[in-house]
């Protein structure tokens, strides 16, 4: 079970790394799509049951989601053990856009607000984080800029004083293919995005210091219904990648995640249990 929890922890920490287009634009749309699927299928509760590499049920990692179609909210409660619990609540507007999230744990609470332009394009993400004792507060803004309704630049502003500029390059189809951040005049290595013939994101690539070459950090495969059926995550500081394989039911709701390590050995799995009702 330790290896399974380590895999989950690695994925969570890896998901917070700086791929701004993927995290802000793609990730926010994924949350909206999940909530829309729950609403369309009258889902009101989801329980994620975890199993280790020996197919033994574990209560060390527990996730429960509660969806309210009336309030347009999705509350996700995650417990990694008896002492560590976090609650993430996401809110939608009438256009199915995520407009707010609150993420709270025993240590930190983060409130994030999202705004959109008249065309439904994300223009700002503003987050405020404070510790449980209210002794420290941090803020971060992501201000998205567009040129002819296509992504051009994003400003990341921390605590209203520290600004990083993230510039984007697009292909002929309008897909983001490169992002590069500049802070205090110093440019960071670029992140590259690759797509298939259907304009679906297939790879996110950056320079790997250990390998001394460009390597993918994410790789995606899709079903004919455009659902992600496999995701490979590769940490930037090593090559111990994880393979996540997904299964869905006929309504497009995720039913199972199976996780393998680099050696193709089963690390664990997660099964989804749905409850339905208005």
Features from the language model and the residues they span:
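N-terminal signal peptide c-region/cleavage motif recognized by signal peptidases
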Residues: 13-15
